[in-house]
């Protein structure tokens, strides 16, 4: 992976650039609490991924550098605001279209890590659930129902000793539904620590008191895909380490 000379991205102050390749592929390490894209009004906001205007019709951010030159960042997928980790975009619409096709065809290999409750009855392996979206008091909620099939391969990596009974798990989803991993964990009674919608609220408060950790402990840690552009095969891989506060739980 090579970084190339590029205009400075007007990134959220807690996010950072991981890669900007000659092919136009851009990878950003998004901080927890940052929106992948703005709310419908499209206005600049300190909680947005980029401090720039967002053009909804073209799914891109646009800004002008000090020399008066206009630049764009085309968003290729999204992460929930509470989730941290790798988010992919492109500096040009052609590359963005190719990447979006890979996401749509489920040809992107994604790996997440999460800290969850420990439940001896929960099983690792291949998780399959049918989930539906609902509106409850105007807020989006996802639950088991007669909806799209959601799949993920899951491994339990490490258990923390102590009364909180926490564990680190790896999740590799082959589908990308809204709130999918959070709900799949909740359905197996191992909710993700810090989840303020589907979580164990008592445990969340306890972890916050003990570790000062007040966020969803879900991190997009690895992404891999290939695209063919102008006859050339381009393979892209990117990693993002666990945020320090999450990693400290197991040290």
Report the location of each language-model feature:
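Hydrophobic residues in beta-strands and at strand termini
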Residues: 30, 116, 156, 171-173, ...
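Pseudouridine synthase
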Residues: 46-53, 164-227, 246
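Beta-strand secondary-structure signal
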Residues: 88, 113, 128, 153, ...
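Beta-sandwich strand segments
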Residues: 192-193, 233-235
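Generic N-terminal initiation segments characterized by hydrophobic and/or small/turn-forming residues
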Residues: 210, 239-242
């Amino acid at each position: 992976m090579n970084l190339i000379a590029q205009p400075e991205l007007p990134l959220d102050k807690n996010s950072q650039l991981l890669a900007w390749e000659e092919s136009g592929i851009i990878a950003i390490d998004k901080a927890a609490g940052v929106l992948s894209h703005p709310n419908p009004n499209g206005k600049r906001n300190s909680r947005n991924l980029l401090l720039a205007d967002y053009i909804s019709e073209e799914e891109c951010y646009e800004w002008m550098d000090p020399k008066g030159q206009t630049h764009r960042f085309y968003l290729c997928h999204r992460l929930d605001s509470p989730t941290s980790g790798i988010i992919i975009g492109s500096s040009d619409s052609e590359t963005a279209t190719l990447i979006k096709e890979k996401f749509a065809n489920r040809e992107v290999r994604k790996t997440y890590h999460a800290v969850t409750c420990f439940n001896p009855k929960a099983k690792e392996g291949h998780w399959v659930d049918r989930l539906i979206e609902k509106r409850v008091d105007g807020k989006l909620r996802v639950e088991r129902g007669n909806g799209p099939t959601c799949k993920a391969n899951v491994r339990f990596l490490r258990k923390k000793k102590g009364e909180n009974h926490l564990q680190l798990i790896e999740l590799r989803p082959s589908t990308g539904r809204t709130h999918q991993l959070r709900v799949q964990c909740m359905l197996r009674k191992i909710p993700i620590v810090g989840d303020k919608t589907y979580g164990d609220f008592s445990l969340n408060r306890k972890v916050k008191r003990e570790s000062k950790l007040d966020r969803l402990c879900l991190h997009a840690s690895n992404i891999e895909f290939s695209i063919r552009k102008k006859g050339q095969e381009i393979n892209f891989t990117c990693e993002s380490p666990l945020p320090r506060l999450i990693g400290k739980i197991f040290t």
